[in-house]
Amino acid sequence: MPRLTLTGTNIDAPDANALADFYRRLLGWTTRAEEPGWVIIQAADGGGGRLSFQTESRYVRPVWPAGPGDQQMMMHLEIAVDDLEASVAHAVAQGATLAGFQPQEDVRVCLDPAGHPFCLFLQ
């Protein structure tokens, strides 16, 4: 089998730079590369993977949880935390919103500024 290497995850947004800036502040990461409509961020030490963001002119904000006919989420990020409530407060201070529906006690679903859900969970 040929060697295949996953190098990151690309997230569509109406404004790649704005969404990359949100996740950069949320995670404490740095910008690795930036071009008009495209940004890569990663941990300052180079570990933890990478997230790429691209501007999509026809971006449709997902609805979570989705109902019939709603734009569904395509993926979500799982972010381990050591203090759930402090991490939620940090996420909200950076521009996230707490989702109205919370399916588990030890997980908090938040929405980034472009509407993508992400989960904060105790590890």
Residue ranges and their predicted role:
Residues 15, 37, 84:
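A generic "binding-loop/recognition-motif" signal
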Residues 2-7, 29-76, 88-112, 123:
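Vicinal oxygen chelate
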Residues 14-28, 60-61:
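Short N-terminal helix-initiation segments at or just after the protein's N-terminus
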Residues 1-21, 74-81, 121:
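N-terminal beta-strand motif that seeds the catalytic metal site of vicinal oxygen chelate
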Residues 18, 84-89:
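Short, conserved charged micro-motifs
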Residues 117-123:
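Short, low-order "capping/linker" segments at domain edges
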Residues 82, 116:
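Conserved Rossmann-like nucleotide-cofactor binding loop
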Residues 23-24, 91, 115:
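Conserved active-site tyrosine of GNAT-family acetyltransferases
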